[in-house]
Amino acid sequence: TTKEVFSDCLHRYLIKDAIADENVLGFLVEYYKGKDESGIDYMNEARMKEIARFILTNFNKSTVDGEFNALFAIQSVPMLLQYYKIFKELNPKIKIGAVFTYAANSSQDDEQTGMNQGYANDKVTADELQVIMNDYNNTFGTSFTTDNFSAYYDDINLRMKKKKKDMEPLDLLLVVGMFLTGFDAKKLNTLY
């Protein structure tokens, strides 16, 4: 955790402070909340499909007809894998990517903190990540494997930032514990 790496907090500069100082743009936040959230099965397939349908139905509006892209922060790797399958089933043409690190990479440290982050602990195999990478390769004409995961990660980073004009961008990126802080993408305007 941050406390383990840096010890006690010296100062807090919150997003509300950054907005007030005009260092970042403000947010348009839309909340969708059920009547009673206790006892929700977040892995319920019907629930997940309804959420995916909502995202796809509102996607063009949210991303200004593809001018921007979206990021879906997901709670766990098994949940990400299920959402990935659902999105591919509901809309096979959406340019979707997914990024998480699998157990075989768990010895790698995060560049800035020196600690592991975003790693799958739930019996996730390299094969499951490779299936996602194969879809990505077919969509974008790349040839990434789990052996060159860092190149795949870098490619996703560039596509999300829409930095290269000749590089086709991603529409939607599914993540677990990654791409959430310190990620500056001017063309990313929607966070689920």
Language model: regions and residue ranges:
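Conserved C-terminal RecA-like helicase domain
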Residues: 40-175
